[in-house]
Amino acid sequence: MSWIKEGELSLWERFCANIIKAGPMPKHIAFIMDGNRRYAKKCQVERQEGHSQGFNKLAETLRWCLNLGILEVTVYAFSIENFKRSKSEVDGLMDLARQKFSRLMEEKEKLQKHGVCIRVLGDLHLLPLDLQELIAQAVQATKNYNKCFLNVCFAYTSRHEISNAVREMAWGVEQGLLDPSDISESLLDKCLYTNRSPHPDILIRTSGEVRLSDFLLWQTSHSCLVFQPVLWPEYTFWNLFEAILQFQMNHSVLQKARDMYAEERKRQQLERDQATVTEQLLREGLQASGDAQLRRTRLHKLSARREERVQGFLQALELKRADWLARLGTASA
């Protein structure tokens, strides 16, 4: 089965899609593709067949999203917790991943045609080396495409992602790229695997389970959470349509919460900067409440220097990650 399933919506689907597009549309949807094993049991087939059908449904769902103008999709393909499953099932999932990433490399022309950028998010060091190399090749082959984006979370949990981001910031301080005072929520956000993506507008979980299973916990604090009873391989265009309707009904509340959170971040940063400037002035024997122009000048310099350090650190971090991926992809070429 192809990664990209080409084709148009049916006449009725197109009609309903045009209606729903009159409202606010999500730009980024995340999926917890749950229910493959229960589907296999229901259909009395092997678990591996259930996972294969789940991948086929992903390709179909990407087609729906593309036709609806939803240009970024993130999927929870394999949790670090899944390594605790039986060896036979884990081995089967690794084999399926090998097949699908090998197939992806055979479809480079189709990916180029649609401008699909594939990103794989997670701790790839936990995967077999040959699979790491296949993933690196796929990511490298599509990294310059920018019409639409598929983020595959593989060997991923949100706690692992956040702890890794904290380690990256600590590395920046150790290397002298950052000051300890530069550490903030905003910087942590930029150190996550998802740093190049906007936060999801909708998170959809299938199979009826009402939990996030350690998926995008940081990124979905202001997302529309939709839990649907359908098993993932049985997901339909109308299930997606329903999720978008829920998003539209809650859009104004979600947007207001996002705006308030962004303003609160700015306020907290300004308070920290003001406290730092006050401390500097007192150390120099000047009145903390003295010359307003001097305080503004100091605040501006403090902010500019921090931004310069942060940008230098982020460039170094991106270079470090890209270099590792490039060397991995070259090793298997």
From Swiss-Prot:
Its EC number is 2.5.1.87. Changing residue 12 to A: Markedly decreases phosphatidylinositol-mediated activation of cis-prenyltransferase activity resulting in products with longer chain length. Changing residue 306 to A: Delays cell growth. Optimum pH is 8-9. Active from pH 5.5 to 9.3. It holds the Pfam family Prenyltransf. It catalyses: n isopentenyl diphosphate + (2E,6E)-farnesyl diphosphate = a di-trans,poly-cis-polyprenyl diphosphate + n diphosphate. Changing residue 95 to N: Found in a patient with progressive myoclonus epilepsy; uncertain significance. Ubiquitous. Expressed at high levels in testis and kidney. Expressed in epididymis (at protein level). Isopentenyl diphosphate binds at residues 34-35, 37-38, 85, 205, 211, 213. Its cofactor is Mg(2+). The catalytic site at NUS1-DHDDS interface accomodates both the allylic and the homoallylic IPP substrates to the S1 and S2 pockets respectively. The beta-phosphate groups of IPP substrates form hydrogen bonds with the RXG motif of NUS1 and four conserved residues of DHDDS (Arg-85, Arg-205, Arg-211 and Ser-213), while the allylic isopentenyl group is pointed toward the hydrophobic tunnel of the S1 pocket where the product elongation occurs. Pathway: Protein modification; protein glycosylation; Lipid metabolism. It is linked to Retinitis pigmentosa 59: A retinal dystrophy belonging to the group of pigmentary retinopathies. Retinitis pigmentosa is characterized by retinal pigment deposits visible on fundus examination and primary loss of rod photoreceptor cells followed by secondary loss of cone photoreceptors. Patients typically have night vision blindness and loss of midperipheral visual field. As their condition progresses, they lose their far peripheral visual field and eventually central vision as well. Developmental delay and seizures with or without movement abnormalities: An autosomal dominant neurodevelopmental disorder characterized by global developmental delay, variable intellectual disability, and early-onset seizures with a myoclonic component. Most patients have delayed motor development and show abnormal movements, including ataxia, dystonia, and tremor. The gene is DHDDS. Its main location: endoplasmic reticulum. GO terms for molecular function: ditrans,polycis-polyprenyl diphosphate synthase [(2E,6E)-farnesyl diphosphate specific] activity; metal ion binding. (2E,6E)-farnesyl diphosphate binds at residues 34-35, 37-38, 85. Activated by phospholipids including cardiolipin, phosphatidylcholine, phosphatidylethanolamine, phosphatidylinositol and phosphatidylserine. This is Dehydrodolichyl diphosphate synthase complex subunit DHDDS. Keywords: Disease variant, Endoplasmic reticulum, Epilepsy, Intellectual disability, Lipid metabolism, Magnesium, Membrane, Metal-binding, Retinitis pigmentosa, Transferase. With NUS1, forms the dehydrodolichyl diphosphate synthase (DDS) complex, an essential component of the dolichol monophosphate (Dol-P) biosynthetic machinery. Both subunits contribute to enzymatic activity, i.e. condensation of multiple copies of isopentenyl pyrophosphate (IPP) to farnesyl pyrophosphate (FPP) to produce dehydrodolichyl diphosphate (Dedol-PP), a precursor of dolichol phosphate which is utilized as a sugar carrier in protein glycosylation in the endoplasmic reticulum (ER). Synthesizes long-chain polyprenols, mostly of C95 and C100 chain length. It comes from the Eukaryota. Binds 1 magnesium ion per subunit.
